[in-house]
């Protein structure tokens, strides 16, 4: 038994056309055979989804379905019901020869004369956009070159050379499907399949378009403007609706997914919303303390006070000079790690001063030891 069309698309019976279209696009993209090549059930699910959408997206067919159920839209209903074994009989041929009865048959049971494929959404495509750290931090707009399938502008997608007619397919005589009589255990049956010449359309261009060869589609490389939100990070993905491949049979285009790649920076390293920087200071600055200029991602500088006695590896925080929160407020911090640089080339005067410094340090250490020993001996038992 066929599943309910509303159930297939996951929508309520009073769903709006927009809700039905949205549900269809999501499911069609999920179960498209090209995306699920390893899933043997994907093609059948995709066919089921298209069948449901073809009925529910058409106001007339939807009304018949709501009133009669599947019988109101199933063109094979008469052949499956109580009209006999159907040996060698094609009911649509019978009813089509009786004028108004053919129209009545179509109205009640749906026309099986066309195997036209339902609207097929275009495929999604992916691209990589490389940014500098500054571009990622502050956002903006950047151009991206993308190659994709588009509707042919020369023939506007109908596949015919402008000024030439669209004719009835000579293979299927406009039915969109080919009928073959086959022998089965139950007698002779009529089997239908989509016409390969017109792909179920029932019509073909008399003179194929010189630009697209009759397919209605062409490959184009376009420059697309991508809006970069401030604070975007490496690996983030941006979705550009309708930026993908063109749809077929009136289907909507797919989407473009842009993956962000951030170039390494010569000064800063990023961790989430924070930036890190290593700053070299001299031995004297570390020992005596100093005020040093720290570059920021904004392009300016901040004054950092180095207290006397600072050791290598000490981390200082400059608040609010990191990365903005994506789609939020506030910024991270800039963490500065100091590295005390030991001098490698000293003058004799500098060496002498360091020796004097070392001697004074030793004297202080010896004086401290003497005082400590006297204190210890005084209270010794």
From Swiss-Prot:
Record-linked Gene3D superfamilies: DnaJ domain, Heat shock protein DnaJ, cysteine-rich domain, Urease metallochaperone UreE, N-terminal domain
GO molecular function, one term: ATP binding
An individual GO BP term: protein refolding
Ranges of the CXXCXGXG motif repeats in the UniProt entry: 152-159, 169-176, 195-202, 209-216
UniProt zinc finger (CR-type) residues: 139-221
Residues annotated as domain J: 4-69
Keywords: Chaperone, Cytoplasm, DNA replication, Metal-binding, Repeat, Stress response, Zinc, Zinc-finger
Cofactor: Zn(2+)
Top-level taxonomic group: Bacteria
Intracellular or extracellular location(s): Cytoplasm
Positions contributing to Zn(2+) 1 binding: 152, 155, 209, 212
CDD domains: DnaJ, DnaJ_C, DnaJ_zf
Xref: InterPro entries: DnaJ, DnaJ_C, DnaJ_domain, DnaJ_domain_CS, HSP40/DnaJ_pept-bd, HSP_DnaJ_Cys-rich_dom, HSP_DnaJ_Cys-rich_dom_sf, J_dom_sf
Main location: cytoplasm
Binding site for Zn(2+) 2: 169, 172, 195, 198
Keyword Metal-binding in annotation: yes
GO cellular component: cytoplasm
Cofactor note: Binds 2 Zn(2+) ions per monomer.
Role of this protein: Participates actively in the response to hyperosmotic and heat shock by preventing the aggregation of stress-denatured proteins and by disaggregating proteins, also in an autonomous, DnaK-independent fashion. Unfolded proteins bind initially to DnaJ; upon interaction with the DnaJ-bound protein, DnaK hydrolyzes its bound ATP, resulting in the formation of a stable complex. GrpE releases ADP from DnaK; ATP binding to DnaK triggers the release of the substrate protein, thus completing the reaction cycle.
This protein's domain notes: The J domain is necessary and sufficient to stimulate DnaK ATPase activity. Zinc center 1 plays an important role in the autonomous, DnaK-independent chaperone activity of DnaJ. Zinc center 2 is essential for interaction with DnaK and for DnaJ activity.
Subunit-structure text: Homodimer.
Protein name as catalogued: Chaperone protein DnaJ
Provenance organism: Carboxydothermus hydrogenoformans (strain ATCC BAA-161 / DSM 6008 / Z-2901)
Lineage of the species this protein comes from: Bacteria, Bacillati, Bacillota, Clostridia, Thermoanaerobacterales
Gene that encodes it: dnaJ
């Amino acid at each position: 038994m066929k599943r309910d069309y509303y159930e297939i698309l996951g929508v309520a019976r009073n769903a709006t056309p927009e809700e039905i279209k949205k549900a269809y696009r999501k499911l069609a993209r999920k179960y498209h055979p090209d995306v699920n090549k390893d899933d043997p059930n994907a093609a059948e699910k995709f066919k089921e989804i298209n069948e449901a959408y073809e009925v529910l997206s058409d106001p007339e067919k939807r009304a018949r379905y709501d009133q009669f159920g599947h019988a109101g839209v199933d063109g094979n209903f008469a052949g499956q019901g109580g009209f006999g074994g159907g040996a060698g009989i094609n009911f649509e041929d019978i009813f089509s020869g009786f004028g108004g009865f053919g129209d009545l048959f179509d109205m009640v049971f749906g026309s099986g004369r066309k195997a036209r494929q339902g609207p097929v959404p275009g495929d999604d495509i992916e691209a990589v956009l490389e940014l500098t750290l500054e571009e990622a931090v502050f956002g903006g707009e950047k151009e991206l070159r993308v190659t994709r399938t588009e509707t042919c502008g020369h023939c506007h997608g109908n596949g015919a050379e402008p000024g030439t007619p669209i004719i009835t397919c000579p293979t299927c005589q406009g039915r969109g499907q080919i009928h073959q009589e086959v022998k089965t255990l139950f007698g002779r049956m009529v089997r239908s399949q989509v016409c390969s010449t017109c792909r179920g359309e029932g019509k073909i261009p008399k003179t194929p378009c010189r630009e697209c060869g009759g397919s209605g589609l062409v490959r184009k490389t376009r420059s697309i403007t991508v809006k970069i939100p401030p604070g975007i990070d490496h690996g983030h993905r941006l979705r550009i609706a309708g930026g993908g491949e063109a749809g077929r049979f009136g289907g909507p285009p797919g989407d473009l997914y842009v993956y962000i790649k951030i170039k390494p920076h010569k000064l800063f390293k990023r961790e989430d919303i924070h930036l890190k920087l290593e700053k070299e200071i001299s031995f004297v600055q570390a020992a005596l303390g100093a005020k040093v200029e720290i570059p920021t991602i904004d392009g300016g500088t901040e004054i950092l006070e180095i207290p006397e006695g600072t050791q290598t590896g000490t981390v200082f925080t400059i608040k609010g000079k990191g990365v903005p929160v994506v789609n939020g407020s506030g910024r991270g911090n800039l963490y500065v790690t100091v590295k005390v640089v030991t001098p490698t080339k000293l003058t004799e005067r500098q060496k002498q001063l360091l020796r004097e410094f070392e001697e004074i340090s030793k004297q202080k250490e010896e004086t401290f030891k003497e005082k400590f020993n006297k204190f210890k001996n005084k209270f010794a038992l």
